[in-house]
Swiss-Prot record:
One of its GO terms (biological process) is maintenance of rDNA. One of its GO terms (cellular component) is nuclear membrane. The keyword Disulfide bond does not apply. This is Nuclear rim protein 1. Keywords: Membrane, Nucleus, Phosphoprotein, Transmembrane, Transmembrane helix. The gene is NUR1. Interacts with CSM1. Residues 416-457 are annotated as: Disordered.
Length: 484
């Protein structure tokens, strides 16, 4: 057992030694990579920074940070003008220039030596070396260094805000040239030159390799005529984080504090300036941009609903429409909106006038849905002038006069046939050329026995009963009857 314990201990020690060697080799590799390729570390840091959603920290980090830097600059300028500036002569004058004890000429005369010794014993000679002025000298140097850092940071934020956030858009379908300095016209052959912009964004070592090896023609080419052009829009789109940081740490406040005598009353002007700038840019201009985005989204949605979806629904109606009727009735698409008073407005698009027309508020003029029309297609509806037509079949506005005349002719034919039947006469389909339609025939609405009795009492009673039955029960008549 003792030998096994020793073996296990030796095995465990070897594992620990191996882990230490691996950790040391890993650290050596990291230091070697850092020394040989420091730009790779810069790329890694930039990737980590770009992956952070800075807009989420616009209100919680950017605005408090900018206000803190502005207040810090104000306090430093206040101390400089009220604490350092009155003692500027005492802090910057050399004390050795008035040290009479170092003069060999004065030492030759006794009375002058006594005068110089009296100056040395006074407090004015040693005032430059007191702890108070030593502290002021240190604060003066610290204030200068801090102001230099704050000015550099403000200059960087301002340049980043004004010149660092641009995106380029290639507009190939734009035909009209607008009056904008950010919109430029280019040839299609210029697209191959954009390949160099990607090289400039790479590391320094990649750029050197590219330019020392020679330019390779790896960029995209467009085989187009020289006359063909496209527009390029360079749009300025700063992020919310940099906007809030620029507003709270504005260069106008920094310039005002740098070139003016700062006092406690200057704080009122700084607070008023910060509030006005934040109100104009973030609460008015930035929200106006968001409102324009809402309006453009609403206009695009309205165009999609009224134009694109209407065309899609029209094509689907053409595909699903049955061809049994022979012609297709055009049902315009109804769009429902609301007025400012909350009243419902129904509009239909007139393709001839190219505008929307408001429909009357009567419910009879509004066509029903397709499901309602299919459900009630087999029924018969009665209108006010005792006309009958199938429910769900709506005529086109252009064809409505034609069908109205047809229905009127059918009603006249029906009324004339009813009058003749009341007089004792009967009409056979082959004997009358101006007979009514099959669906409106009076013989279709009466049973066979009643028609037979009515026929027997007419002027055609000279025919025998078999001939009458054969005429009434003819195959053609039966076939037409089932076609209904």
């Amino acid at each position: 057992m003792g030998s096994n314990d020793l073996i296990n201990e030796a095995y465990d020690d070897s594992e620990v030694v191996g882990e230490e060697r691996e950790s040391k080799s890993a650290w050596m590799k990291r230091w070697y990579q850092l020394l040989t390729s420091p730009l790779d570390l810069q790329l890694v840091i930039n990737e980590k920074l770009e992956m952070i959603n800075w807009d989420a920290y616009a209100k919680s980090l950017a605005k408090p940070l900018g206000n803190f830097l502005t207040i810090l600059f104000f306090i430093i300028r206040l101390l400089q003008d009220n604490l350092i500036k009155p003692n500027y002569y005492k802090l910057n004058v050399k004390s050795g220039a008035f040290d009479l004890s170092k003069s060999n000429k004065l030492k030759e005369f006794d009375y002058l030596w006594e005068i110089s010794s009296s100056f040395q014993n006074s407090n004015q000679f040693y005032a430059f070396q007191s702890w108070y002025f030593v502290t002021l000298r240190f604060l003066n140097n610290l204030f200068r260094f801090t102001i230099f850092i704050l000015l550099s940071l403000n200059l960087y934020v301002s340049c980043k805000f004004m010149f660092g956030y641009f995106k380029t858009y290639n507009l190939f379908h734009l035909k009209k040239e607008f009056n904008s300095p950010n919109l430029t016209k280019h040839n299609l052959k210029d697209l191959s030159k954009e390949y160099y912009e990607d090289i400039y964004k790479q590391s320094l070592w990649s750029m050197l390799k590219h330019f020392f090896r020679g330019s390779r023609d790896d960029g995209p080419h467009v085989n187009q005529n020289e006359v063909e052009i496209f527009f390029q829009l360079r749009k300025w789109i700063p992020t919310n984080f940099i906007i809030n940081l620029f507003v709270s740490f504005s260069p106008t406040a920094i310039v005002f504090l740098s070139f003016s005598d700062v006092s406690f009353t200057s704080a009122i002007a700084i607070v008023f300036h910060q509030y006005i700038l934040d109100y104009i840019i973030t609460k008015r201009f930035q929200r106006s941009v968001d409102d324009d985005l809402i309006l453009s989204s609403a206009a695009l949605q309205e165009y999609e609903d009224k134009h694109i979806m209407a065309r899609i629904n029209q094509c689907s109606n053409i595909d699903t429409l049955s061809s049994a009727m022979g012609t297709r009735s055009k049902t315009p698409r109804i769009f429902t909106t609301h007025s400012l008073c909350g009243e419902e407005i129904r509009e239909v698009y007139n393709y001839e006038k190219r505008e929307f027309e408001a429909l009357p508020k009567m419910t009879e003029s509004v066509p029903g849905s397709r499901e309602t029309r299919i459900k009630d297609y087999g029924g018969i509806s009665q209108v006010s002038d005792n006309q009958s037509h199938p429910i769900g079949f709506h005529y086109s506005p252009r064809m409505s006069p034609y069908y109205r005349d047809k229905v009127l002719d059918n009603n006249l034919a029906q009324s004339s046939s009813n009058e003749n039947l009341e007089k004792g006469g009967a009409f056979l389909p082959n004997q009358d050329q101006n007979r009514p339609s099959k669906s409106l025939s009076p013989l279709r609405k009466t049973p066979l026995s009643a028609r037979q009795k009515r026929f027997e009492g007419s002027e055609f009673n000279v025919l025998n009963k078999n001939d009458i039955n054969s005429i009434l029960r003819s195959p053609k008549k039966k076939k037409n009857y089932h076609k209904r």
